[in-house]
Amino acid sequence: MLRWLTAGESHGPELIAVLEGLPAGVPVSLDGIRADLARRKLGYGRGARMAFEQDELSLSTGVVHGRTLGSPIAVRIGNTEWPKWVDIMSPEPVDPEKLQGARAAALTRPRPGHADLVGMQKYDFDEARPVLERASARETAARVALGAVARAFLAELGITLVSHTLSIGPVRVPEGAPLPTPADVDALDADPLRCFHPETSARMVAEVDDTKSSGDTVGGVVEVLAYDLPPGLGSHVHWDRRLDSKLAAALMGIQAIKGVEVGDGFLTTTRRGSEAHDELFSTDAGIGRSTDRAGGTEGGMSTGTVLRVRAGMKPIATVPRALRTIDTATGGAAPANHQRSDVCAVPAAGVVAEAMVALTLADAVLEKFGGDSVGETLRNLRGYLDAIPEGRRTGADLVDEADAAPPAAPEA
């Protein structure tokens, strides 16, 4: 199984992440991780911090000459802005004279929608700085770095991930629009909002512009697709072993995510049973499904079709036209603290969601197929697939009902 942990504050010296349980032999490069960290900064509507904040990446342990060793992997992401925060975020006591000025002022006006107030209550802080530093989405850089390593492992098994933006505010990709494939990743990353539907992307840009001009923020929905998963990841046996349960928890753990769907999700609740499920048909290639409404999972297990999971991101809570709050130092009404923020970070949320799905799937693969090396894991996977009896093997991802063999007539 995989175990992983991140540490670090938004304006601290560095973020640290440790990943344990990955087999030996996974090809890992700093350039590959840097590429995903750069993708995390993409998207129309991002704030100024993305322009000047650089990720100083290093691998401390677990990788030698571009291959994992099977031992814990430690990633460090240095903060180029640290010199500005040395005194304010120092782990050692600092002369109060050095803590003068606006940057060091106590943050006593908690922001609605953030962890500020509840964190102050829970941890007995008299200001929000100790809370917001860790609650910040800056922490997701560490998760994206680990996700890049997990993606490299999955790629060795032929599994690839793609994310794209489905909606920004009320602007949404039309139902039934083509899904992006791994071949479309470069085109997606070149789009200002990582949307695969050009006409919708242009309307999304206009929505972000309108939101910015009104001093507001906007959210949206992203979708992650996983191609070429084997059937049988996860289990129906216990709630906490269900693959969709693990994916939902992983995605809900991303800052500002307020909802998750698997497959057609809540749309399925509007249909009758005869139109809500994926019928099975026999083909020359094996068993196929007429649709993928379930989104690649049934009974808590992967089906072998394309996995589809969606995450809904709320509008960023740090609103330029500051929301109303209470100054906890005086008890009086006040505008909320406002720091640099994005108008829209939905495209970046897609990249973070990719990382979380990659880590979750890598863990599920290792739970099912084990292996102390990539080669052993791959042999176990192939052996499992070869052992599935011919009459139970799945073939093409989707089958056109008109081309499928009719179901056998029941015996008299």
From Swiss-Prot:
One of its GO terms (biological process) is amino acid biosynthetic process. One of its GO terms (cellular component) is cytosol. Its cofactor is FMNH2. It is an enzyme of class 4 (lyase). NADP(+) binds at R40, R46. It catalyses: 5-O-(1-carboxyvinyl)-3-phosphoshikimate = chorismate + phosphate. Reduced FMN (FMNH(2)). Homotetramer. This is Chorismate synthase. It comes from Clavibacter michiganensis subsp. michiganensis (strain NCPPB 382). The gene is aroC.
